[in-house]
């Protein structure tokens, strides 16, 4: 939306990184998880894998996960608060607490309830539902901003973007080698993300890994194409209809 098509290299890097994660990490990790006691968490797996250093590995890995995921979780709570604020601002009055603050509290409460009550299965099911909603939105919204009222189609959108900044539709314009390398290496993060790795550990059997990989990569490909399309053509839609692009 802001930087143009050059930012799509991040999506390509994520796609490649996820694919290699499925190919290189998932089968081996699932096999090792079964071999070392069917651990269900990363600290437990490391402790079972290296029993002579189990306590230190549990402690260090747990601290790292808690510290870095605190920031990750906080971003989700902020998003929930902003969504609640934008959706219900001026409709409900919560006294001294703002709509944003109430949104954060509701988001936190819902997540805590289904996590504590349902555990990992509940988290996986809600992730599946959220993923379906996201993919549906990322398929529908690009079509809406292109072909809906005020969209104008591909030709009008491309013309609008070229008039604003011709580099918005370029894959390389204004992109240095370091910038490109930084974008495509985002996918390396998948190799160490705990919430992804534990799902590899939880796959039913080793034979199910290719099936899960195909489903996951298919979802990711569709979603990334939709996200890039929405970002690019959404800016054209905003400009054509006089919306605030900030």
Language-model regions, residue ranges each:
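Membrane-water interface regions at transmembrane-helix termini and the short interhelical loops
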Residues: 2-5, 82-86, 109-130, 199-205
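Helix-loop-helix junctions that connect adjacent transmembrane segments
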Residues: 91-98, 143-185
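Small-residue-rich segments of transmembrane alpha-helices in multi-pass membrane proteins
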Residues: 48, 130-144, 218
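Helix-loop-helix module between adjacent transmembrane segments
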Residues: 9-115, 185-189, 223, 231, ...
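Membrane-interfacial loop-to-helix junctions in multi-pass inner-membrane proteins
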Residues: 42, 55, 59, 124-128, ...
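Juxtamembrane transmembrane-helix termini
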Residues: 27-34, 82-92, 121-124, 144-154, ...
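Membrane-interface helix-loop-helix modules in multi-pass membrane proteins
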Residues: 1-38, 177-190, 196-241, 246
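Hydrophobic/aromatic positions within or immediately flanking transmembrane alpha-helices
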Residues: 11, 101-104, 124, 134, ...
